[in-house]
Amino acid sequence: MTILVVTGTGTGVGKTVVCAALASAARQAGIDVAVCKPVQTGTARGDDDLAEVGRLAGVTQLAGLARYPQPMAPAAAAEHAGMALPARDQIVRLIADLDRPGRLTLVEGAGGLLVELAEPGVTLRDVAVDVAAVALVVVTADLGTLNHTKLTLEALAAQQVSCAGLVIGSWPDPPGLVAASNRSALARIATVRAALPAGAASLDAGDFAAMSAAAFDRNWVAGLVG
């Protein structure tokens, strides 16, 4: 059994499509997969990341906890809605209930690693420590990514959360000079597990499955579950 938290260097970097792609690749490798998104914001505009994972990857074991209408950071979205954030033990219990032998459990955060997900001030990093998870970091290939990536990795290391690698959430075609340079530099910081093509979320399920299988190394995916 393996719990992998999927975090990112910020909002809009492609965490959901990466969750879906890794889930699809794992399922094609014969691995049982569950996906958890403890906190979802932006529901008033139709944001539903778990439904997107289900549509793209065919995962049926999907679990969420708190949903807030406005597309804001969870604490701000909760305050705006007159609601509370979940408690730390609620999130931990949600994840623990999914975890089982032979299963890969993916836990998608909201925004970046240190965004508050639970009261008081609990972040995805704290949850990762609680459930003994490793982290996959979704990054961009844009200017600023090297600094943002290093800051995220330093924050993980500060609490002894292992990094399973990086995934570029949206890889342009063709890549420009900056993207190509940053991809090489990112690979010197940590292992780049995949670079998903820009617009991958718009693919149908069949094309998405083929893309996902090609994007990730099958041996690495198979080795995620011991």
UniProtKB/Swiss-Prot annotation:
Any one cellular-component term (Gene Ontology): cytosol
Entry keyword annotation includes Manganese: no
Binding residues annotated for substrate, in chain numbering: T41
GO molecular function, one term: dethiobiotin synthase activity
Reaction(s) this enzyme catalyzes, per UniProt: (7R,8S)-7,8-diammoniononanoate + CO2 + ATP = (4R,5S)-dethiobiotin + ADP + phosphate + 3 H(+)
Active site, per annotation: K37
Pfam families cross-referenced by the UniProt entry: AAA_26
Residues the record lists as binding ATP: 12-17, 49, 108-111, 169-170, 197-199
Lineage: superkingdom: Bacteria
Cellular localization per UniProt: Cytoplasm
Family matches, as InterPro entries: DTB_synth_BioD, P-loop_NTPase
GO terms for biological process, alphabetical: biotin biosynthetic process
Pathway annotation from the record: Cofactor biosynthesis; biotin biosynthesis; biotin from 7,8-diaminononanoate: step 1/2
EC category: ligase
Co-factor requirement: Mg(2+)
EC number: 6.3.3.3
Keyword annotations: ATP-binding, Biotin biosynthesis, Cytoplasm, Ligase, Magnesium, Metal-binding, Nucleotide-binding
Principal location listed in the UniProt entry: cytoplasm
Family statement: Belongs to the dethiobiotin synthetase family.
Function: Catalyzes a mechanistically unusual reaction, the ATP-dependent insertion of CO2 between the N7 and N8 nitrogen atoms of 7,8-diaminopelargonic acid (DAPA, also called 7,8-diammoniononanoate) to form a ureido ring.
PANTHER family recorded: DETHIOBIOTIN SYNTHETASE
Annotated NCBIfam families: bioD (TIGR00347)
Record's subunit section: Homodimer.
UniProt name for this protein: ATP-dependent dethiobiotin synthetase BioD
Lineage: Bacteria, Bacillati, Actinomycetota, Actinomycetes, Mycobacteriales
Gene responsible for this protein: bioD
